[in-house]
Amino acid sequence: MIEIRLKKLRDQFKKYNLDGYVVPKNDEFFSEYSNKDRLGFISNFKGSAGYAVISKNKNYLFVDGRYTIQAKIESSKNFKIIDYKEILDTKIFKNLNLGIDAKLFTSDQIKRFFLKNNRVTIVNENLIDNIFKTKKNKLNPFYSLDKKVTGENHIQKIQKILSFLRKERLDYIFVSAPENVAWLLNIRGYDSPTSPIPNCHL
């Protein structure tokens, strides 16, 4: 099963002239408890943190010390297991053109992990999702928390941000972390079975 998935992933490399593709554990909301476990799908690794790099001929799984034994049990048949710290220094991928879904990485991660020794191509579709057939994400409703619980309503919080923007002569602010949006708007949701934080940006 994993071998078939890896082949389907590699079959997409030619379209983007890729030498490899990087798959993180987190989703676009940087939650380790994602409804889309792309890393688990392509590697069979079920830990809460890690990266897979699939090249044209080899597969690598980077995990930290918590998961070394687990990764060997779950993924060593198809992947070489490497300590997570070595992703910063490894020359395995030197001069390779690695494809990434930019929504799944911070700019710092891209600079530190990949641009140091490689070229990076931002792929405008997720190559794992192309073979990971799941139901479309359901739009779950949010619910609001009362001021008695939060201490301030969302209008009061937004007014503070607007005052800051005016003071700093800024036009807008982008809030990427769902937990910060949840705090600002006093909302919670049902997107995750393990957390009340809704999947959102602002």
Regions found by a protein language model. Give the residues of each.
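Short glycine-rich phosphate-binding loop at a beta-alpha junction
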Residues: 97-102
